[in-house]
UniProtKB/Swiss-Prot annotation:
<feature type="region of interest" description="Disordered">
    <location>
        <begin position="125"/>
        <end position="189"/>
    </location>
</feature>
<keyword id="KW-0539">Nucleus</keyword>
<comment type="similarity">
    <text>Belongs to the SCM family.</text>
</comment>
<keyword id="KW-0804">Transcription</keyword>
<protein>
    <recommendedName>
        <fullName>Sex comb on midleg-like protein 1</fullName>
    </recommendedName>
</protein>
<keyword id="KW-0678">Repressor</keyword>
<dbReference type="GO" id="GO:0005634">
    <property type="term" value="C:nucleus"/>
</dbReference>
<keyword id="KW-0597">Phosphoprotein</keyword>
<feature type="compositionally biased region" description="Basic and acidic residues">
    <location>
        <begin position="159"/>
        <end position="168"/>
    </location>
</feature>
<feature type="domain" description="SAM">
    <location>
        <begin position="258"/>
        <end position="325"/>
    </location>
</feature>
<comment type="function">
    <text>Putative Polycomb group (PcG) protein. PcG proteins act by forming multiprotein complexes, which are required to maintain the transcriptionally repressive state of homeotic genes throughout development. May be involved in spermatogenesis during sexual maturation.</text>
</comment>
<dbReference type="InterPro" id="IPR047531">
    <property type="entry name" value="SAM_Scm-like"/>
</dbReference>
<dbReference type="InterPro" id="IPR013761">
    <property type="entry name" value="SAM/pointed_sf"/>
</dbReference>
<dbReference type="InterPro" id="IPR001660">
    <property type="entry name" value="SAM"/>
</dbReference>
<keyword id="KW-0805">Transcription regulation</keyword>
<feature type="modified residue" description="Phosphoserine">
    <location>
        <position position="138"/>
    </location>
</feature>
<feature type="modified residue" description="Phosphoserine">
    <location>
        <position position="238"/>
    </location>
</feature>
Length: 329
């Protein structure tokens, strides 16, 4: 008999002959087909093949992931190299800009000058309306000579002011309280004669070059009060043919004590045609003697806006002033 779980498709039915002719019973023999016998092992092998394919696919995915990871690592390395190169370029550029920057020497000077001017402005309580001091700064005004022999009382030289020329020397109230400056024309150009060797009054000169006095510091030490009481300078309209009157012996220290008005007077007397346009500029910036000696062509051109020719002339006069030389127009 054929089992219920099997079918005719999976078995081979064979009729078995009988030798009993009276019996109508027919016998069949059933055999399983060879294909059906090997069907279950084939199913197992197919499952194993599918497992291998899945494992191979997983391996391929892992390999691709590893390749992607390696690529990302290489990309990170390249990014690090690029960052190092960029930082190196930035450092090189900063070092280049620092080493090749424009050196403005006037910046520090400008800061000090502004600070100095501000400090002077705070200390200044009143505006100087005229060029006047307790001592006489005009060589055209004859005043009595000091009788004190102290070298610290040596008068300071200055320039001739045109507004003082029309003043009467005898009627000026300043004469009674101001000393007389040491006039360099009291000594000859080729032969130096001290005051104690001269007789009578001091001889004023109206012409001749500016002459330094090498013995100016020892004049008052050897000068007698008897000669000082008899000495009176003469009033002259012009000192040396030009408006400059500076002692070479004291010019190295005296210009630093000038006020703003003294600097303005220096500009007017030195070169009126070229330097008079700078008067208002110097007054607005309150440039005194110390600031004048510190001026350079860069400061004049870039900060004060002075023209090139005027700046060159003024620098030349400042250099001459530092050397203690007189200016001849």
């Amino acid at each position: 008999m054929m089992s219920s779980s099997s079918s005719e498709i999976d078995v081979v039915k064979t009729r078995i002959p009988t030798y009993d002719e009276d019996d109508d019973t027919i016998f069949y023999a059933y055999e399983t087909k060879p294909d059906f016998v090997n069907k279950e092992p084939n199913t197992v092998s197919d499952a194993s093949c599918n497992t291998e394919e899945q494992q191979k696919t997983v391996n391929d995915v892992l390999i691709h992931c590893q390749v992607i990871y390696d690529a990302m690592q290489n990309l990170d390395k390249k990014i690090d190299v690029i960052r190092r190169k960029v930082s190196k370029i930035q450092r090189f550029r900063a070092r280049f800009l620092w080493t090749n920057r424009k050196r403005y020497g006037y910046k520090n000077y400008s800061y000090q000058l502004a600070k100095k001017l501000k400090r002077q402005k705070m200390k200044k309580n009143e505006v100087h309306e005229s060029f006047s001091y307790p001592e006489s700064y005009s060589p055209t005004l004859p005043v009595s000579r000091r009788e004190n022999n102290s070298p610290s009382n040596l008068p300071r030289p200055s320039f001739r002011m045109e507004e003082y020329q029309r003043a009467e020397p005898e009627e000026d109230p300043i004469l009674s309280r101001t000393p007389s400056p040491v006039h360099p024309s009291d000594f000859s150009e080729h032969n130096y004669q001290p005051y104690y060797a001269s007789d009578g009054a001091m001889h004023g000169s109206s012409s001749g070059p500016c002459l330094g006095n090498p013995g100016a510091n020892s004049i008052y030490n050897t000068y007698s009060t008897d000669h000082a009481s008899a000495a009176q300078p003469s009033v002259t309209g012009s000192l040396f043919g030009n408006d400059c009157y500076i002692e070479e012996g004291s010019i190295t220290k005296h210009p630093s004590t000038w006020s703003v008005e003294a600097v303005v007077l220096f500009l007017k007397q030195t070169d009126p045609l070229a330097l008079c346009p700078l008067v208002d500029l110097f007054r607005s910036h309150e440039i005194d003697g110390k600031a004048l000696l510190l001026l350079t062509s860069d400061v004049l051109l870039k900060h004060l806006g002075v023209k090139l020719g005027t700046a060159v002339k003024l620098c030349y006069y400042i250099d001459r002033l530092k050397q203690g030389k007189c200016f001849e127009n």
